[in-house]
Amino acid sequence: MGGKNKQRTKGNLRPSNSGRAAELLAKEQGTVPGFIGFGTSQSDLGYVPAIQGAEEIDSLVDSDFRMVLRKLSKKDVTTKLKAMQEFGTMCTERDTETVKGVLPYWPRIFCKISLDHDRRVREATQQAFEKLILKVKKQLAPYLKSLMGYWLMAQCDTYTPAAFAAKDAFEAAFPPSKQPEAIAFCKDEITSVLQDHLIKETPDTLSDPQTVPEEEREAKFYRVVTCSLLALKRLLCLLPDNELDSLEEKFKSLLSQNKFWKYGKHSVPQIRSAYFELVSALCQRIPQLMKEEASKVSPSVLLSIDDSDPIVCPALWEAVLYTLTTIEDCWLHVNAKKSVFPKLSTVIREGGRGLATVIYPYLLPFISKLPQSITNPKLDFFKNFLTSLVAGLSTERTKTSSLESSAVISAFFECLRFIMQQNLGEEEIEQMLVNDQLIPFIDAVLKDPGLQHGQLFNHLAETLSSWEAKADTEKDEKTAHNLENVLIHFWERLSEICVAKISEPEADVESVLGVSNLLQVLQKPKSSLKSSKKKNGKVRFADEILESNKENEKCVSSEGEKIEGWELTTEPSLTHNSSGLLSPLRKKPLEDLVCKLADISINYVNERKSEQHLRFLSTLLDSFSSSRVFKMLLGDEKQSIVQAKPLEIAKLVQKNPAVQFLYQKLIGWLNEDQRKDFGFLVDILYSALRCCDNDMERKKVLDDLTKVDLKWNSLLKIIEKACPSSDKHALVTPWLKGDILGEKLVNLADCLCNEDLESRVSSESHFSERWTLLSLVLSQHVKNDYLIGDVYVERIIVRLHETLFKTKKLSEAESSDSSVSFICDVAYNYFSSAKGCLLMPSSEDLLLTLFQLCAQSKEKTHLPDFLICKLKNTWLSGVNLLVHQTDSSYKESTFLHLSALWLKNQVQASSLDINSLQVLLSAVDDLLNTLLESEDSYLMGVYIGSVMPNDSEWEKMRQSLPMQWLHRPLLEGRLSLNYECFKTDFKEQDIKTLPSHLCTSALLSKMVLIALRKETVLENNELEKIIAELLYSLQWCEELDNPPIFLIGFCEILQKMNITYDNLRVLGNTSGLLQLLFNRSREHGTLWSLIIAKLILSRSISSDEVKPHYKRKESFFPLTEGNLHTIQSLCPFLSKEEKKEFSAQCIPALLGWTKKDLCSTNGGFGHLAIFNSCLQTKSIDDGELLHGILKIIISWKKEHEDIFLFSCNLSEASPEVLGVNIEIIRFLSLFLKYCSSPLAESEWDFIMCSMLAWLETTSENQALYSIPLVQLFACVSCDLACDLSAFFDSTTLDTIGNLPVNLISEWKEFFSQGIHSLLLPILVTVTGENKDVSETSFQNAMLKPMCETLTYISKEQLLSHKLPARLVADQKTNLPEYLQTLLNTLAPLLLFRARPVQIAVYHMLYKLMPELPQYDQDNLKSYGDEEEEPALSPPAALMSLLSIQEDLLENVLGCIPVGQIVTIKPLSEDFCYVLGYLLTWKLILTFFKAASSQLRALYSMYLRKTKSLNKLLYHLFRLMPENPTYAETAVEVPNKDPKTFFTEELQLSIRETTMLPYHIPHLACSVYHMTLKDLPAMVRLWWNSSEKRVFNIVDRFTSKYVSSVLSFQEISSVQTSTQLFNGMTVKARATTREVMATYTIEDIVIELIIQLPSNYPLGSIIVESGKRVGVAVQQWRNWMLQLSTYLTHQNGSIMEGLALWKNNVDKRFEGVEDCMICFSVIHGFNYSLPKKACRTCKKKFHSACLYKWFTSSNKSTCPLCRETFF
């Protein structure tokens, strides 16, 4: 290729990748050419001949393997890596015979690629090798010798993953037992390869200098050398002993090479490390050979002792020790005092240079191997050695690292013990070790807190213990005596430095702490040693352990080597002090020292009140609490105890110095108020108690102290100290369980609760410690038992519960947060800690109260959020404890039983608002989730059963639900009623309290959802009942026509908590639930029937599941209310056949009823209602059947006319009669819709006369509209009138033929007039009585059908109205009174709160608007020139209304920036304001369009002055959507333009509400469209004067959505125009928004192009002309300007503008004669007119023609008259 991002090189048609090239070559030729690197036999593995000469060999290698092997010879790392991975995969996947063919070629490749520079390649090579081994197994044996050297090197690779991969391959080939044999088999070849690498190879021989960079060559060489050295070591370790002799010669030759010994000084640390490892291995495995090379080994190793590289150091020191062990005369070849020791001293003085953990463990073995000859004089040598060693502790690195300092300290004590052991009896050395080393070292440590850790003191204790043990057991008296002297001397010196530290008046804190820690360790060395979590390697001296069998020693890896004469092991803790008793050699001096220090300390406390010495004394007494020490502390002071103490206490004081000290000193210190931290004083108390003889004495002392002497904080501290320590707890157990402390704590609880509630003073410092004390005694347990007696625990909990119970009843002003908070803390700790203790009865009462506080809203409890959170955590911890008690059950648990009853009462009897219910459900959620963890599987089911109401309780709650839900089903005809079950009370009900049925169903549904996670079994169909009741609640909410906000919130809460039918139905039995619903529907009807319809409609249940329940149609008869409602709800989902079956059951029943039966449910009313329900879905298409029923109804009128409520007073009508009338009217409406057969004249008369009579009844009974059935009667009456109006409005010539003669004229002249003469006054009356009632309210239900009917009113009927006169004083108008009355009556209704009224009024006024401008036209002359800018107002009624609306919209939209879209909630108050405003503007614009151009100018000036149009435009850009596209256009054909609110006409429907959310946006777009179309100049003026941001928003929106529509309409008007121009043709191009006019005069063509801008009509229209013909420049410009101005600023159309322009041109050329020379009006070249006139004949000629005539004829005469021209 031509490189990255370049074109392929010309002619380079084959792939550039080497792998792909090889693959292509193999495909073309069938073989791969031979290449260097593979041998033809086992003896010669270096060369592979060309394949053409060795087909028989190459045929053994698979072609895919050939390809991969070829890739492996490439230099590219990626190619090699992928090839090796591919090779490994192929080895795994191919059969063994195929893979075996690769073996002859593998060794050469492996040997080369295993040394590759890239570590990934090396790792992949070893991984592939392992796969090859696993496949070929023993077949690899012939090739081992060629491989083994490099294989061993690979196992020592410096890249660990590669080394591990090589070891894995080696282990896959050879089990551990066979590995030595394999190495022995190849030992000569291995040695040869490794020696060559070490002696012969160089960077340039290993890598090609021509192609490999120097840095890479050197790196590879260093790695190869390192691996070779390590491989030699591995060879030595793996080889059996009997094979070593055969390699001596080869190793001799290696060791004879100076190059080998130079590796010890190599600059690369990895090489030096590998070198020293090899030296160690050689010393161990071939010691004789190393002895021979002593002169080279010794300097090479010992003189490198100061090498501080972390890589080299471990191997170096290992080599040092092996050298000292193997070569006895090594010191002959180096100068120890001048060369080795100074280097060693420097290293250890510097703390090992950061390698103390590596170097210092080797120091003891090192000095143990030093011959005496080179350490003389011993005193100086050991003194310098130890001094240097201690100096290492002073380095920064050692101070900051605990591991480093531990290593130094450990080495110091090991060496000190060794030197002491070796030189015992030599006083100078003994003195030096104690006086100059050990004591100064301890003194330095006591001063430095950084060194005061357990390791140092443990080592000291261990050293002393070993000396003491040896002195006790040593048989040699001299040695024992020497050791005793050393110990005596040590204790004397130690006593001196300790006394000196404590005797300082201002004792150093660190020193005092150090002394106390030291004494503790010396007192209890074993226990302190146990505190050390990590076991450290210790040195065990030869005389302390049995000699190990040296013959079994074997060379292992460098970690944990065993070397002759010394051994690293883990020493057990003090063997001789296992009993815990101190040696007499330590006990007496230690006690003497303690007494001295105690005496010094108490003196400082008494004299100077030294806090520091008192703390030290506390620590001292903790370890040394004896009568002797307490006597020392009392000194010579006499007993001064108060005589009022009981006799028993007085005796104890006399007998026991510790008790005397307690009363005499300690109590006074404890009661000092200024002391904040007194925990150490309590420790002294415990030390004194230890000196009592028995528990009874201790209890007596503590009881006495509890009564009077001890404060609450002291008691708290005593108990706190007892909890974590079993020793201390054992001392005070009788006192804790006793009556004295128990009663005091109960009194404390009582005091705290009362004081906190009454005083209302929450002082944390005063109460917190006491509350903590209560919490402690309730929550702490020892061996699953309370600290104090159970009876006192019970009494304390009872007191806390009583306090909480009071809090629950307090008002907000009385509540006390602090008491609740403290009780929460106490209770939480109590519940959380009582894991092994059973809850007490009182604690369950407390738990219930906590739960109740959490399950109630903040408005009731008046508790802040933080306390509610605390309460929740507290009661949850209690419930969690309760359910995990093994023997807990529902019956035994007071809490579970009472909480269930309380929950049941809360939802049934209590008044809950949304917030309260949400809090309750949340608490129940927490409770039940905790109960789920119980092992009792029935617990949850029983709990839910306890909350579940019985059937009568459910029924009572259902009946208590308000009945307003019936409004919608009645209006929509889904249910029918013939009795008055309620009267609608429109007064505001409680707007917060939720009905109990809703709360109960929500609670139980939530409980069921949680319970069934664990497959809890509910009895007695409780699950189905709960789901049914939830569905009842949800359906009740859904059916409310205008649900209050709190009910909407209730439904939202259920959704958030996933309490939905979909979530519940998967848990229960659907068939069982459906059976339950059908049973209830058949029994009760109403909502139960609607629930079934809802489930079917939402596809929650299928029709197949429902069918079995209505299969027997006859079972629903005789009709009851339940059966009727069930059938009505099922009707929408029944098939035609099923509906016919039900209808067949009803039709016979409609015949022959008495008046009473006609109105009953099982009579005419019920059966007609079922028939109507079936007819609603147009499933009955039998015209004869419909006619038959109509005739039956007509017969009813004849037989029982008084049943028909014609023009009567409904207050006297019964609900049954109202019900049957409603069903008759409904049937007639449905009959009109679905009956296609013609009606007889008498039938038409019955329908229309009945309709008008029912409307009269409606009109006469407006006062009874509050009665639901009357309201429903009014609705269906108006519906029938509306349906009739729609029927006659939609009649065509075809349908008129089927109607009786004169029916249309009768309708128009009588019935239609009668309808509107009744409904128009009703509209005025109803809207006048109720100003602020929304259309969704039941009271305004009849507005929809009434208003829809009024939209059919004709203009003539409007103008002939009989409304009372309504005129406004000072209202300027040219309209006649009847018209002004109509405007003044209807226009204000555009502000009415109901949308149907607004739309109906709009439709009526819209019909009047075109008639109004003519009245202003008649009075146009009165608007003369007396005004500078004459203006005329549109109809005053509309403008006054507009003024009100502008103020309302300013409140709604004024604060919203222009361009920010406002979403108006449908049917809200703001919705009605905006709707009325926009409808008003549509009327004004309609009025404006109907006016003449003169009037439009006057109206425009008025709108400009009032700035109403500007306000409108600002509001429109807050209401129009950013994307005014119809949602359904997304799925339409993409090539078509999308439908927008500007392309689609707005249908202002009263009944259709599905598009309500888009109503305002669409209407706003419609108004904007009209404004741009009818008032473009005014919009353009506003746009140009607006600020830049608004300017851009308007421009962008108009260009994108409106301009194209208006441009298309303008262009289309040109294309469809019938106007014809003589001599001018007009063409329009819609795509380019251009209109081209072509004006033709003779042979001359003039083109005029008018182009509309992209933001039309905001931008200027461009007028272009190609040629100027026969007109002066200025005149031509004037014409163009006139046309442009007319189109842009005068709201003119394009056709009108073109007519204007043509008129100008025609006038210019009108009457112009032809030039008598060229016989044309316009000159053919310069387009001029004939202007030069002859003075004689007056004929005019073109100047150019005349000039040509003069020049060609050589005469200056007129061409026509031949007279001289000039």
Swiss-Prot record:
GO terms for molecular function: ribosomal large subunit binding; ubiquitin protein ligase activity; zinc ion binding. Component of the ribosome quality control complex (RQC), composed of the E3 ubiquitin ligase LTN1, TCF25 and NEMF associated with the 60S ribosomal subunit. The complex probably also contains VCP/p97 and its ubiquitin-binding cofactors. The gene is LTN1. Keywords: Cytoplasm, Metal-binding, Repeat, Transferase, Ubl conjugation, Ubl conjugation pathway, Zinc, Zinc-finger. E3 ubiquitin-protein ligase component of the ribosome quality control complex (RQC), a ribosome-associated complex that mediates ubiquitination and extraction of incompletely synthesized nascent chains for proteasomal degradation. Within the RQC complex, LTN1 is recruited to stalled 60S ribosomal subunits by NEMF and mediates ubiquitination of stalled nascent chains. Ubiquitination leads to VCP/p97 recruitment for extraction and degradation of the incomplete translation product. This is E3 ubiquitin-protein ligase listerin. Pathway: Protein modification; protein ubiquitination. Belongs to the LTN1 family. One of its GO terms (biological process) is ribosome-associated ubiquitin-dependent protein catabolic process. SUPFAM superfamilies: ARM repeat, RING/U-box. A zinc finger (RING-type) spans 1715-1762. Autoubiquitinated. It catalyses: S-ubiquitinyl-[E2 ubiquitin-conjugating enzyme]-L-cysteine + [acceptor protein]-L-lysine = [E2 ubiquitin-conjugating enzyme]-L-cysteine + N(6)-ubiquitinyl-[acceptor protein]-L-lysine. The keyword Metal-binding applies. It comes from Homo sapiens (Human). Gene3D superfamilies: Leucine-rich Repeat Variant, Zinc/RING finger domain, C3HC4 (zinc finger). InterPro entries: ARM-like, ARM-type_fold, LTN1/Rkr1, LTN1_E3_ligase_6th, LTN1_HEAT_5th, Ltn1_N, LTN1_UBC, RING-CH-C4HC3_LTN1. One of its GO terms (cellular component) is cytosolic ribosome. HEAT repeats lie at residues 59-96, 100-138, 273-314, 335-372, 380-418, 433-473, 513-551, 611-658, 676-714, 768-810, 911-949, 1068-1105, 1184-1227, 1314-1352, 1377-1414, 1475-1512. It holds the Pfam family UBC_like. The lineage of its organism: Eukaryota, Metazoa, Chordata, Craniata, Vertebrata. Its EC number is 2.3.2.27. It is found in: Cytoplasm, Cytosol.
